[in-house]
Amino acid sequence: MPVAVKPFKVGDVEVGAGELFLIAGPCLVESEAHALKMAHAIRAIAERMGVPYIFKSSYDKANRTSINSHRGLGIQEGLRILGRIRNDAGVAVLTDVHDPSQVPAAAEVADVLQIPAFLCRQTDLIVEAARSGRTVNIKKGQFLAPHDMKNAIEKVTSQGNERVILTERGSSFGYNTLVVDFRGLPTMRGFGYPVVYDVTHSLQRPGGLGSSTGGDSQFIEHMARAGVGCGVDGVFMEVHDNPAAALSDGPNSLPLARLEPLLEKLKTIHSLVRDEL
C-alpha cells in the first residue's frame, strides 16, 4: 500500500517528494582542495543525471577502530571548509555531530545534522539537533530493529521539528560483518518520513583489517539497486576519486568513475517503483 511521506526542502533539494536524491562525498574532509574538488565533481555528475544532490563529509570521525586512525581536521577547520563548499559549489551540506555541544556550530554551516548510528539512542544529542531547526538525519544503529526508529523520530518531533530523515546502514552479523534486511526500508518508510539507504557503510567490515575497517566495494552497485528497488527516497554513498588513498573508509567507498553509470541505473529503477510508494 502506498505510504504518504512528508516532503520538505533541504537547500534546493526536495526530500520525500517522489524524486530520488543523492547524499554523497568523501567520508572525511581530508583537505580543503580535495573536498572542493569532490563536491564540484559529484555535483556535475548529479546535474547531468538529473539527481538532486546533498554533499556529505565529516570534520571529525570520533568512532575509529584504532587510536592511530586519522580523525580529521577538527570541528573549527572542518566546518570552515564545509561552509566554503556550501557557498562555492552551491550545494546543501550534511555533516555528523557527536555531542550536543557541537550542534550550535555545526548548525550554522550544515543543512543536515546527522546522528551517527552508534549514537542513535542518545536523547540529549538528538533533542539538541532537533532544536537547531536543521534537518536531522538519524542513522539506524547496527544493533537496532527498524521499528524501534519510531522512538528516534519522536525525539525530534517532540521539539517541533518535522524535518526528519531515517537512514539504513546495515546490522551487525557476527564479527566484522554487516548485513542488510531490506524489509527494514519499507518498515521505516511506513512512519511517514523519508528513508535513505546508506549503501557504502552497509558494506563495511568493521575492524576487519585489525587496526582499521575493511569493506566490500565490489558489491556497491548490487546493493544500491536492491535498496532503490525497495522504494527509498534517497541513497547515501561515500565517493572518492582514489579510494586506495582515502584517509577513512576507502575499502567501502565508491570510486568516482563508477558514480555516473550507477546513478543512471538507479534512476531507471526508481522510476519503475515510485508509483508504488
Predicted feature locations:
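Catalytic beta/alpha-barrel core
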Residues: 72-74, 88-102, 111-124, 135-146, ...
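Alpha-helix-loop-beta-strand connector modules within alpha/beta enzyme cores
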Residues: 41-49, 68-94, 129-135, 185-195, ...
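Structural preference for beta-strand elements that scaffold enzyme active sites
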Residues: 19-23, 50-56, 92-94, 111-112, ...
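Active-site-adjacent loop and "lid" segments of alpha/beta metabolic enzymes
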Residues: 68-76, 112-119, 175-182, 203-228, ...
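N-terminal small/glycine-rich loop or linker at the start of catalytic domains
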Residues: 11-29, 57-68, 194-209
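Glycine-rich, proline-tolerant flexible connector loops at the mouths of alpha/beta enzymes
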Residues: 26-35, 53-75, 240-250
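Catalytic alpha/beta core domains of metabolic enzymes, predominantly
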Residues: 132-239
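N-terminal amphipathic alpha-helix/helix-capping segment at the start of soluble metabolic enzymes
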Residues: 1-22, 80, 271-277
